[in-house]
Amino acid sequence: MAHNKFLPRVLAAAAAMMLLAGCSSKADPGFSPANPVNITIWTYYNGEQLEAFNALVDEFNSTVGKEQGITVESSSHGSVTDLENNVLASAEGKVGAEAMPNIFSAYADTAYALDEMGQIADLSDYLSEEDRTAFIEDYLSEGNFS
């Protein structure tokens, strides 16, 4: 039963990927297979969570992503602490750090620190009221820095 506590996180990440697909209907960003876009996602998922998430990424890439020219590349950065350290090193431009990913898993304290550095995008314009109902209200409130 331990893996059940991770299900909401995997579902939230899946919802985020589906929102990427939905964005084109609200404000046409011009996605096209002729002009492909690559989205990088960093997680701390391992084991079953990583397998489930990678299956969602593969499904997205072979369906909506393929149709719209969006490729998602996901990578696990080990533990939550490892991921936090890697994201912060990237945001701070430390020597040897990888380029900042487009999307990453983060707890509120890390997200807040990155927001203070100007590294967090406001997704409010991309979530309709209907979209918001798919999430647990506390998750949305915790991630609202305004």
What function would you assign to each model-found segment?
Residues 1-39, 62, 129:
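Short, low-complexity disordered leader/linker segments with a strong preference
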Residues 14, 99-100, 119:
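Short loop/turn motifs at secondary-structure junctions
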